[in-house]
Amino acid sequence: MSQVQVQVQNPSAALSGSQILSKNQSLLSQPLMSIPSTTSSLPSENAGRPIQNSALPSASLTPTSAAAESITPTVELNALCMKLGKKPMYKPVDPYSRMQSTYNYNMRGGAYPPRYFYPFPVPPLLYQVELSVGGQQFNGKGKTRQAAKHDAAAKALRTLQSEPLPERPEGRRPGEQVNGRESEEENLNKSEISQVFEIALKRNLPVNFEVARESGPPHMKSFVTRVSVGEFVGEGEGKSKKISKKNAAIAVLEELKKLPPLPTFERVKPRIKKKTKSIVRLQGSTDCSQGMNPISRLAQIQQAKKEKEPEYLLLTERGLPRRREFVMQVKVGNHTAEGTGTNKKVAKRNAAENMLEILGFKVPQAQPTKPALKSEEKTPIKKPGDGRKVTFFEPGSGDENGTSNKEDEFRLPYLSHQQLPAGILPMVPEVAQAVGVSQGHHTKDFTRVAPNPAKATVTAMIARELLYGGTSPTAETILKNNISSGHVPHGPLTRPSEQLDYLSRVQGFQVEYKDFPKNNKNEFVSLINCSSQPPLISHGIGKDVESCHDMAALNILKLLSELDQPSTEMPRTGNGPMSV
């Protein structure tokens, strides 16, 4: 009969084998939550090393506390140094030497037998690390080198956490300069060679790296590299060309940083002016086959006939290498055709055109693929069902045979210096009637008043005097002789609209302004109608209505000042007003 001693919260008791079996069954039948109560009274010798069940999660450890414990002081210090703009540098220090006793080392037989000799107790080995952050130094100790780093980082964290974070200027972008120089924290990510080239590029300085000399045995070479940046020269030495080049850049970079900062300039964005479209697209034909590729058209014809598609074959190539000529053959049923071209595509197209002609289809003329520029030719435009002829002409381009006395001719006005703005139509009879010009409907009953040469000469003289001096002695004389015409103005007239009104009162014609709303350029447009002989029409553009009137009146005054001058212009046969 075996005996086992069990201790569970109660004094120890002796149990027999049958009692042990029944006790185990009762313990297994208890719920799982009762286990912590039985294990709560463990011996005190295990209190320092708690035993955790791997199958059950620990109730004392939460995910937050576990994540916090996983972050080491070195990681926290690196994150803090990035915010402060500092770089931590770890430097290992030699560990402490062991303190061993020299007793009984040089004696053969000591005072004590060797079997009873115990060495002097030796302290554990300690590692030491020196941490430097922004000019401050911290020492850390530990059983391992990593533990020493953690100790030094923890000391640095307690000191650096109290420092305020540097303020970053608002609106500053990465890479932007402050006082002509880039911030040091951005230069930390750049090599010294890159910084040298960047400074030289901004100051227009040439950079040249060259290996000055080599020394040492083949397995231990030493290189000296010289760098010249404008007037600055530096040398660097290293075991390889790369290291010596970097050291040379470091040497010359110290001198380049002493240069005064560059002045900052604000770049003005260039104003992009939209080009006016001077391209007229030719109207396409209503026939869809006119602009179709002959190759595609031939293929569609065969598909519509439900016949076999055309077969193309390259027969030969001839000519010089730079002046090749290809011969392509196309076969449709029993018909064959050939086409030549400078490349295979052109030859294939010509072969398809020839095949279309053989099959009896009309081959359209080649249409220009790109829009054509405006042509300078002035060709007459005829409208079906209308007996009028519209002819464009320019001043000075007289036609001896063009003096026709037909009553069904009507000549459109020529725009001498610029085109009419958007919203203004040329002075055809319908528009002239709408704006109030004394002009009948475009029928064959034209009633044109013959101009008076003497009155035109006087009008031109007054217009010239007003344009050049603002006053007109001729007009003053006319007003003095004719009391009913009006009073003489006191002082010169400065505005062209006032000068034109004064001239109209003296000569007895009317001036009428038509104002239009603002256009897409936020400008006003005014149309002026002068009932002189011949009638004159002009327009003005400006930021306000007064400037529009002045511009239009100035154009009319210039036309009136040229009435008495001989003109080579073609005689006018219609009664349409002149436009400028």
UniProtKB/Swiss-Prot annotation:
Residues modified as Omega-N-methylarginine: 115
The record's listing under Gene3D superfamilies reads: 3.30.160.20, 6.10.250.1360
Q: Which residues carry this modification: Phosphoserine?
A: 183, 285, 397
Residues bearing N-acetylserine are 2
GO MF annotation list: double-stranded RNA binding; mRNA binding
The record's subcellular location field reads: Cytoplasm; Rough endoplasmic reticulum
Instruction: Show the segment(s) annotated as Disordered.
Output: 34-59, 158-189, 367-404
Keywords, alphabetical: Acetylation, Cytoplasm, Endoplasmic reticulum, Methylation, Phosphoprotein, Repeat, RNA-binding
Which cellular components does GO assign to this protein?
cytoplasmic stress granule; dendrite cytoplasm; neuronal cell body; plasma membrane; rough endoplasmic reticulum
- Where are the compositionally biased (Polar residues) regions? 34-44
Residues found modified as Asymmetric dimethylarginine: 108, 115
Q: Which residues form the DRBM domain?
A: 72-162, 191-258, 293-361
Q: Where is the composition biased (Basic and acidic residues)?
A: 165-182, 373-391
Complex and partners: Binds tubulin. Binds with low affinity single-stranded RNA or DNA homopolymers. Interacts with CASC3 in an RNA-dependent manner. Identified in a mRNP complex, at least composed of DHX9, DDX3X, ELAVL1, HNRNPU, IGF2BP1, ILF3, PABPC1, PCBP2, PTBP2, STAU1, STAU2, SYNCRIP and YBX1. Interacts with the influenza virus nonstructural protein NS1.
The record's function comment reads: Binds double-stranded RNA (regardless of the sequence) and tubulin. May play a role in specific positioning of mRNAs at given sites in the cell by cross-linking cytoskeletal and RNA components, and in stimulating their translation at the site.
Q: What is known of its domains?
A: One of the DRDB could be involved in RER binding. The C-terminal contains the tubulin binding domain (TBD).
This chain's protein is named Double-stranded RNA-binding protein Staufen homolog 1
Q: Which gene encodes it?
A: STAU1
